[in-house]
Amino acid sequence: MNFDNYFPVWNELNTAQKKLISDNLITQHVKKGTVIHNGNLDCTGLLLVKSGQLRTYILSDEGREITLYRLFDMDMCLLSASCIMRSIQFEVTIEAEKDTDLWIIPAEIYKGIMKESAPVANYTNELMATRFSDVMWLIEQIMWKSLDKRVASFLLEETSIEGTNELKITHETIANHLGSHREVITRMLRYFQGEGLVRLSRGKIAILDSKRLETLQRS
């Protein structure tokens, strides 16, 4: 599929605006683990995922990571272009969780079109509101939801994303997603194993009882 099939307001642009984007559009292939955007040091531009998976996260003062949200096929990220929106000062890092093909609209190009096009401006505001809603939901989870429920939710989300109950993932990776410490996650997973919910092996977690994990995350 072409870029115009992925950009929701493409048909709302005039011919000159379409040409401006097409002439400046960057196509990029990134390997798993590549950092695409690194906080306010970068003004990468608007990212649109053609295929693959990206992770957007923040770093605490102590260097702990916590995942804000993930980006999948046809998802767009505006926080990588937050420099064009003066009211937003949000330092995020974006890295590829899988090999990813993406498009980048340079920040200044998008900023100019956003000023000219009401549909693009409206779409941008809606997308930003959605992302901040995701972040607020995450904050609520961290503040009010116990770690066992958050780990259960994460494992179930991973099985849905990967399409398998045999997850290739480390305890450190889970800790980074949840803003916790590896040792704490290890203790929790060992507890889950003792309860017959999962089976642990080096670099792998097998989900044995999804129904009980679902019950745990809802309790």
Predicted regions and their residues:
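Short alpha-helix-to-loop micro-motif enriched in aromatics/charged/Gly
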Residues: D61-L68
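Polybasic "coupling" helices that flank or enter modular domains
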Residues: E97, K115-S180
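Short phosphate-coordinating micro-motif centered on Lys-Gly-acidic
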Residues: I36-L41
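Phosphate-/nucleic-acid-contacting segments
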Residues: L147, L156-S219
